[in-house]
């Protein structure tokens, strides 16, 4: 951001010295958009299943869309853009002469002039979080509302989602003509929150029983978490019984489809099954038990693991990226009368997972390391 305010999308090359970081000297500016106000400026950036880059931009901010950008397809504001950063598409339309991308065959594209060819979906207020279902490829948009309604939309090429004529399903700035508009698959009012944080359709295994195939999302203000199921004739929405997590800013998924979320407190949280167990041997869960305390912990963490299973038992600690940071036991059956401990003093603050694996079951427990 600068003065005048603008949003920038840039490409960086990985550092040759450290491939996990970007080389700041390699910046290539792909796109810059002038912003009239200091909110609703952007936020979402991801490659879709088609290999194109998708970027979301709000209506330019302030409140009530004073510049009427939501229903103006000749501006890139209030939209999700689809860009080809590998070349091979049409020339940029509304991105300016210095834009470094081409335009794929978006539905709205009509050549120079008229609607911006870069637009994939529009009529959005603040779609700062959107995602794609890793199984079906379907795009999901969480659009932050104005006075009363937060909404979830299914992304369609060329779709107009109604802002600022509509807020969710409600008429906002009439006259309100619904023709040609796409309305939310779900909405909730401000008695439950005030700023939706979009998530993902869960495709992992750790919480498949509870969340499989459902769109998991939350609210920044209330900290509530929900799972939306649209597989039936009518969508159903369930608040997850995990408490509330205020200032929830973003969700993410790993290579296995496991789901995480973060807050402004700097911690990373991961979704697990309600029972935190999976069993393949048909034996009762009582034969394997795992408890971890204290949490939060600053230094010594105690792990009580009971496993009467035949064969070896392994107990290890993992960070949120799935990297093993400590092995507490790898051998014969364990008794809870002999607790395990590990020193967390050398670990960065954050969420960790203690996992016990036997021939019959896998149990996991979370522990937060605080500083």
Annotate the PLM regions.
Residues 8, 59-238, 257, 271, ...:
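Beta-propeller domain segments
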Residues 272-288:
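Low-complexity, Pro/Thr/Ser/Gly/Ala-rich linker/spacer regions in secreted
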Residues 5-46:
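Asp-box/WD-like beta-propeller blade repeats and closely related beta-sheet repeat scaffolds
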Residues 34-43, 120-122, 246, 334-337:
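Short glycine-/Asp-/Thr-/Trp-enriched loop segments that recur within the blades
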Residues 1, 57-59, 143-144, 219, ...:
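Recurrent small/Gly-Pro-centered beta-turn motifs in extracellular repeat architectures
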């Amino acid at each position: 951001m600068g003065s005048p305010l603008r949003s920038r999308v840039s490409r960086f090359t990985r550092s040759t010295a450290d491939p996990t970081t970007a080389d700041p000297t390699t910046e290539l500016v792909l796109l810059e958009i002038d912003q009239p106000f200091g909110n609703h400026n952007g936020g979402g950036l991801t490659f879709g299943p088609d290999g194109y880059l998708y970027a979301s931009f709000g209506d330019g901010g302030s409140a009530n869309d004073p510049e009427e950008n939501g229903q103006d397809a000749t501006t890139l504001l209030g939209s999700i853009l689809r860009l080809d950063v590998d070349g091979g598409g049409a020339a940029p339309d509304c991105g300016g002469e210095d834009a470094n991308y081409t335009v794929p065959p978006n539905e709205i594209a009509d050549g120079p002039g008229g609607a911006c060819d870069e637009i994939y979906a529009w009529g959005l207020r603040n779609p700062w979080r959107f995602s794609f279902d890793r199984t079906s490829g379907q795009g999901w948009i969480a659009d932050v509302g104005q006075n009363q309604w937060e909404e979830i939309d299914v992304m369609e090429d060329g779709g107009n989602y109604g802002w600022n004529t509509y807020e969710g399903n409600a008429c906002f700035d009439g006259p309100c003509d619904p023709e040609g508009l796409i309305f939310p698959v779900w909405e909730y009012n401000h008695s439950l929150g005030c700023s939706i944080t979009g998530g993902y359709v869960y495709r992992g295994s750790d919480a498949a029983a509870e969340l499989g195939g459902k769109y998991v999302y939350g609210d920044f203000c209330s900290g509530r978490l929900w799972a939306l199921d649209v597989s039936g004739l009518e969508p159903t929405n369930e608040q997850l019984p995990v408490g509330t997590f205020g200032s929830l800013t973003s969700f993410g998924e790993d290579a296995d489809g496991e789901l995480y979320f973060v807050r402004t407190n700097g911690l990373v949280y991961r979704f697990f099954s309600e029972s935190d167990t999976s069993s393949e041997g048909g034996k009762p869960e009582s034969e394997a038990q795992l408890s971890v305390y204290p949490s939060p912990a600053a230094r010594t963490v105690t792990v009580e693991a009971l496993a009467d299973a035949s064969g070896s038992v392994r107990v290890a600690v993992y960070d949120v990226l799935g990297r093993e940071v400590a092995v507490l036991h790898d051998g014969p059956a364990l008794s809870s009368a002999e607790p395990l401990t590990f020193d967390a003093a050398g670990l960065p603050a954050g969420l960790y997972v203690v996992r016990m694996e036997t021939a019959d079951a896998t149990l996991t427990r979370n522990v937060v390391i605080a500083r």
